[in-house]
Amino acid sequence: MNKIIIRKTEDLKEWRRNLKCDINFIPTMGNLHDGHQKLISTAQSSNCNTNLLSIFVNPLQFDSKEDLKSYPKTVDKDIEIAFSNGADAIFIPNVTDIYPKKNKSISYLKASKELSSALCGLTRVGHFDGVCTVVYRLLKLIQPKNLFLGEKDWQQLLIIKNLIEEKKFNIKIIPVPTQRDSDGVPFSSRNKHLSKSERKSLKLFSNELENAKIIFKKDKRIDLKQLTNKLKSKNISIEYLEHLHPYSLKKVQSNDNISILAGAIKCGKTRLIDHVFLMKRKPIIAIDGPAGSGKSTITKLIAKELNLLYLDTGAMYRAISWLFKKEKIDYAKESELKKILNNISIIFKSNSISQQDVFINNFCVTEEIRSQEISSIVSKISSIKKVREFLVYEQRKIGQSGGLVAEGRDIGTTVFPNAELKIFLTASIDERAKRRKSELDLRGTEEIDFNQLRELIRKRDFEDSTRKISPLKKANDAIELLTDGYSINEVVEKIVNIYNLNIPKEIQLE
């Protein structure tokens, strides 16, 4: 594809009409630095789409004419950087192209009040309205498939995400982690304004945020007042310093696992922002759903894709069911039940074929626990209070440090009610029976009629959803996905996309 520079909206529309593929869009205000280069190269390596970068200094985003006038403009250098890092086309409109004076139909938008009234919105009144207005205009003109945004401007990213949802644009946001210089300072177009002493102040600020993150990892708390006083003692001019929920931007609550420590400082006449994400533990994904909804297969693939531990809680219940059957345990007798539970050891080991083997008391039962014989008794055994208490305790112990994806029937409601992402996977009974039949036929271990399978699944659904202890039900904050008609890979991709929008990339890299 020939590299192209587009300056007029009419030319942009013509170029777009002639395209035979989707667009990856990287909006910028020019003065490109390493952070922008990462956005472009990420877009280029993500797919085979055309990569379009825009350079437009939006006047609606500036607090004063002086601030707008002083913004660095390096168009020739920007063009060179953009093309050398993977941009296929560059859109460089002027103000009248984006905001035609004679066009009275232009919508000047308001940013989400909830998201724009905190942090930068406290002093930069109207700034995010300007962001929403220009982004809306650009998205309507360009109609991209993907939008690449840096997490460095976290509040802006949230506001644009809200705009896309509100306007029902079919556009996927792909966040890119904050890029930092060798001294820990985040790349910013405004860094060029800094003197050596001002750069030193910014470095101190960024380093103190990083130190606070290290302390939080150990203590699970942060003393905002102490940190503020420490920064002031180093002559750092603080505009704001807040510890907030990363998505609502409201004051952090005691049960919030992930939070953001964000601040803005003044270095001379230059205003600069930085943040760090804080975690008490690594993220957890909880996947619940009825038998045959594809939980195990999908959860395994998600764990592999996101480099998370796969916790197959269903296999744990099946393993205990297998052991009870093997040892002929009378689980109606509490004394006998207590004795065997105190001596049970369940561990998972990776292998090259099924990815994970299940061992109970040193017996490898990976294949045995998937038999119809075990399927017919597992619901009854998993409804026993002592069994559930034992396994929930074991599961929570495994999940203490997070970094896992767990599947079962009560993960989001009972085991990990504070999981960062909860998915409720389901499918019609016919679809689930079809999948189960294919699975059994593939193994070639047992013959079973399709209609018989349908009735067994219907019976299992009733037992799971009506049991007194931890019944199968969707958590209030879970996202329900009906998987009929979707391939496994399509469902996995959908959940991974939801995860990427709900867990900052900067956290995923830790």
Swiss-Prot record:
Annotated binding of (R)-pantoate, by residue: Q61, Q156
Membrane-spanning residues: none
GO cellular component: cytosol
Family matches, as Pfam families: Cytidylate_kin, Pantoate_ligase
Gene3D superfamilies: HUPs, P-loop containing nucleotide triphosphate hydrolases, Pantoate-beta-alanine ligase, C-terminal domain
Record-level GO BP terms: nucleobase-containing small molecule interconversion; pantothenate biosynthetic process; pyrimidine nucleotide metabolic process
Residues reported to bind beta-alanine: Q61
Subcellular compartments: Cytoplasm
Cytidylate kinase: annotated segments: 277-510
Keyword Cytoplasm found: yes
Pathway membership: Cofactor biosynthesis; (R)-pantothenate biosynthesis; (R)-pantothenate from (R)-pantoate and beta-alanine: step 1/1
Region of interest called Pantoate--beta-alanine ligase, as start-end residue ranges on this chain: 1-276
Residues involved in ATP binding: 29-36, 150-153, 187-190
GO molecular function: ATP binding; CMP kinase activity; dCMP kinase activity; pantoate-beta-alanine ligase activity
Keywords from the named record: ATP-binding, Cytoplasm, Kinase, Ligase, Multifunctional enzyme, Nucleotide-binding, Pantothenate biosynthesis, Transferase
Enzyme Commission no: 6.3.2.1, 2.7.4.25
The keyword Ligase is assigned to this record: yes
Enzyme active site: H36 (proton donor)
Catalytic activity annotation: (R)-pantoate + beta-alanine + ATP = (R)-pantothenate + AMP + diphosphate + H(+); CMP + ATP = CDP + ADP; dCMP + ATP = dCDP + ADP
Function: Catalyzes the condensation of pantoate with beta-alanine in an ATP-dependent reaction via a pantoyl-adenylate intermediate. Catalyzes the transfer of a phosphate group from ATP to either CMP or dCMP to form CDP or dCDP and ADP, respectively.
NCBIfam families (alphabetical): cmk (TIGR00017), panC (TIGR00018), PRK13477.1 (NF010004)
Family per similarity comment: In the N-terminal section; belongs to the pantothenate synthetase family.
Name of the protein: Bifunctional pantoate ligase/cytidylate kinase
Record gene name: panC/cmk
